[in-house]
C-alpha cells in the first residue's frame, strides 16, 4: 500500500510502541526527508506493506532503467510471516512505476521474528552490497545526567570543553526563519573545511534544503564564535527521540579555542534540555582511513557504538544488474 498521509506516516514511525532498536527510526525515513528528495528531482514512494514501512527513492540508471533505494529502512513495525514476500511484490508490480532492476535496502533492525535480520534477508533472496550509509555510529543516552555524560568522555575532550569556556567561545542555535540569516556563514566555514581536507561535497542546494527542514523532522544551525567572529558551524537534525550531528566545519587558525569540541558539547546539552533521549553522531568507520580523524574525534565523546546490518540488494533483472555492477567496477 502506498501511503500519502504525512501525519499517519511520521506518527507510525515515531510513536509505535514496537521499537526494535535504540537507533530506529532514522530521519532518512521521515516524511520531510522524502519531500526534500522530491525537491532535488527524485520520485518518492512510501509503502506500508505488512508492517514494513519504506520511504523509497527512485534512482535512474541508463537506458530508461531504475532501481529503488530505501535508506535506513524499511522500518519494521510488525513481524508477520509473509511480510518480506509481500514487501517485494509491492516493488515488482505497480501502476505508478515500472519494475526496477533491483531494490536496495539498509534496515536498522537487528532481528525479525527472533532471527538475525541478515539470515532473514538472505532467505528472502537479498544479497549483501556495499553500504551507502555508514554501518556504524555512536549514540549517547541523554537520559543520563550531564556530569555522567561528561565523565564518559576522554580527558582531552573534557579539557578542551573547559578551555573553550575559559577563552570565551559561545554557541548559538538557530531554528525557523533565523536559519536563513546564518546559512551563508555555515556554508563558508563548511566549504573551507572540505577544501582544506580535500573532502567531497554535494551541490549547495542539498545543504540549503537540509537547513530548511521543519516540522516533525527539523534542523538547526549552530554557530560557535569568539566575540563576533564565527569560527565553527554545524547542522543538526531532530527526529523522533534523536538528535543527529550531520554536517560541521571549522576555520583554520583558531585551533586553540577548541570550538568544534565545545560546539558539539553544547549541542549535546541542548538536545538533552529539549527532551531528546539520544544523541547520534551519524557515522564512524574503523576501516576507512579517510574517516580516521573524524571517527577518533567522535569517539572521544564516549557513547555506545551501534552497528547496522548494512546494505542489501534484491535483484529483479539479473542481466541488467550484472551490467550495472560491471560498469561500476570499470569506472571506479
Which sequence ranges carry the predicted segments?
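A conserved beta-strand-loop-helix scaffold within acyl/acetyltransferase catalytic domains
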Residues: 2-64, 107-112, 118-133, 137-256
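Active-site/acyl-donor-binding loops of N-acyltransferases
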Residues: 4-6, 20-22, 43-44, 60-62, ...
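Flexible glycine-rich active-site/ligand-binding loops centered on an Asp-His dyad
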Residues: 70
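Short histidine/acidic/glycine/proline-rich micro-motifs that form metal-
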Residues: 75-77, 108-111, 283-288
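A gly/proline- and charged-residue-enriched helix-loop-helix capping module
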Residues: 78-124, 133
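Aromatic (often tryptophan-rich) hydrophobic motifs at membrane interfaces
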Residues: 86-93, 208-317, 321-322
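Anion (oxyanion) recognition and catalysis
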Residues: 96, 122, 165, 272, ...
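Short catalytic-loop micro-motif centered on adjacent basic/acidic residues
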Residues: 103-104, 172, 280-281
